[in-house]
Curated annotation (Swiss-Prot):
Keyword Transmembrane helix found: no
Disordered: annotated span: 1-26
Compartment(s): Nucleus
Native source organism of the sequence: Arabidopsis thaliana (Mouse-ear cress)
One family name in Pfam for this protein: Calmod_bind_M
Name of the featured protein: Calmodulin-binding protein 60 B
Gene transcribed to yield this protein: CBP60B
Keyword match DNA-binding: yes
Region named Calmodulin-binding: 8-85
Recorded superkingdom: Eukaryota
Molecular function terms, GO-annotated: calmodulin binding; DNA binding
Tissue expression per record: Expressed in leaves, stems, flowers, developing seeds and root.
Alphabetized UniProt keyword annotations: Activator, Calmodulin-binding, DNA-binding, Nucleus, Transcription, Transcription regulation
Subunit text: Interacts with calmodulin (CaM).
Entry similarity comment: Belongs to the plant ACBP60 protein family.
Lineage: Eukaryota, Viridiplantae, Streptophyta, Embryophyta, Tracheophyta
Amino acid sequence: MMDSGNNNMNRAKRNLDGNDDDQPERKRPAFASVIVEALKVDSLQKLCSSLEPILRRVVSEELERALAKLGPARLTGSSGSSPKRIEGPDGRKLQLHFKSRLSLPLFTGGKVEGEQGAVIHVVLIDANTGRAVVYGPEASAKLHIVVLEGDFNTEDDEDWTQEEFESHVVKERSGKRPLLTGEVYVTLKEGVGTLGELVFTDNSSWIRSRKFRLGLRVVSGCCDGMRIREAKTEAFVVKDHRGELYKKHYPPALNDDVWRLDKIGKDGAFHKKLTAEGINTVEDFLRVMVKDSPKLRTILGSGMSNKMWDALVEHAKTCVQSSKLYIYYAEDSRNVGVVFNNIYELSGLISGDQYFSADSLTDSQKVYVEGLVKKAYENWNLVIEYDGKSLLDLKQPQRLSITHTNLENYSTAAIDHPMQMVAGHSSSMPPNQSPVLSDFAIGGYDQTLATRYHSHPQLLNSNPRAQFEVASCSTSQDQFMGNLHQTQSTINNQHMNGLALGPSQSSTSGYQNINPSSVHQADLNHLEDWSNPRERGPDDFFSEEEIRLRSHEMLESEDMQQFLRLFSMGGGGNGSATHLPEDGYTFPSFLHTPMQGYDEDRGRSGRAVVGWLKIKAAMRWGFFIRRKAAERRAQIVELDDDDEDGE
């Protein structure tokens, strides 16, 4: 028994010892784990330290908002919130408004300006009437400019309370300068104020909405007892000034680099593709877009989506155009041409001295113009460049802009004071003056002299003694100037309408009506009828006796006699009377025989030639009237003598 008990005790001891041997030892942490845990604790402590100022500021702001809401309630003894709409004692509802939009984007350190550099105006209005408040103490209130959160009151037509406005005012970050510096106060004058220089010192990326607004409120203590609703601008982003070097321009300028346009990054793929094709500026981009838009789209490739393309084109079209113009003349008629602006876009059509905008053309005219535009793009080297300031000042004329009164005034002035007309014409046309664009009227190479003098009304002498009809003068020129017509046939072939003289006819004392349109029959096309004068009837002419009397008065004037003496001395080579023609006067050789390749660009000399021929024609007509009058007087005297002999 004793042995068995000992055995059991020994077995139990072995089992107990064995259990102790089988139990695993406690796992010791690795050295790396200890390091990681230590770093985590340290990082957490640093995070808490960095979050503490932020948490303190948030708590402080929330407490300020809560106290601001509780303050008015305690003063008024009401626990409800303030009403949304508050009117003054006189029933007016006063509101501040920004009348100018900001120039975006804004950068830190940059001046806050209106669109295109304009100043920013604010106004105080009465919302009930929509009119500005120009009287009363509120019209000269002092205002404070503050920065608001971008998500404050996105609805433009929604009112807000003063507490709501104050709760969204943004303060500067801890340790930073004031968020908005400069002239943060403005005083109204008759209800209108102008913002001074304002500068942001910090970007808007650190607030929840990542955008700012400018707010405007009445300074505390001003206009007490009167509610004036605050003003706010649209939400905008303020970027760091380091990105200003790469900012886009709104609107872009013609000479801006092409990467200033939306969707084209500097030194990006699109930028490199455009520069490889010689498209370096915004003006180059617009010109290619107007002339061949599919080509430009192909250059940019499939990497630019349709949405990006639309945004790019829309931004480019906001570019401000210059006054430069380009004109392409039709091959068959040198007084008809199409006008392009500086980006090669069709602006209108010129015919004679008239300008027609592209919007005013009829369907048939548009078909003709489209053909000219296509030819102009194919032969751009033939397009002539002009300064478009004179064209921009034009008033678009009616269908008939050259009146008979203008032609009469010119003819009268040319006969009464020919030297003044020629001297004035020469001095008023500089050597580089274009024959197409004058100070007032725009005409082509077929422009008549009367039309050109129409652009210089100060040169025309309106003499009431000589308001005879131009049709009579033209008839006389056609009847008695056949020799001049033969001499100037070369210039007539060059489409100089001022020299379109009819064939030589017999010298008769009668005057017959001539249809003015027949004179220009060789040069007519379907566009030139816009500027042709109407026909004149026989009843519109002066009588022969009245014409004779008035021409006699003109020729007997002192100015005309001095003019004739001058030409008598200068003509014929030596001024001898033996060299005078039958009319008693000679003319100096001002007109040289034109060569076969007459240069159409010699606008000034061409106009001078036309001027001298007009004067010579008018004078020859006067000489003919005097000669015929003398012959008639001689015939009357002879008949009287015969009657006396018969008696």
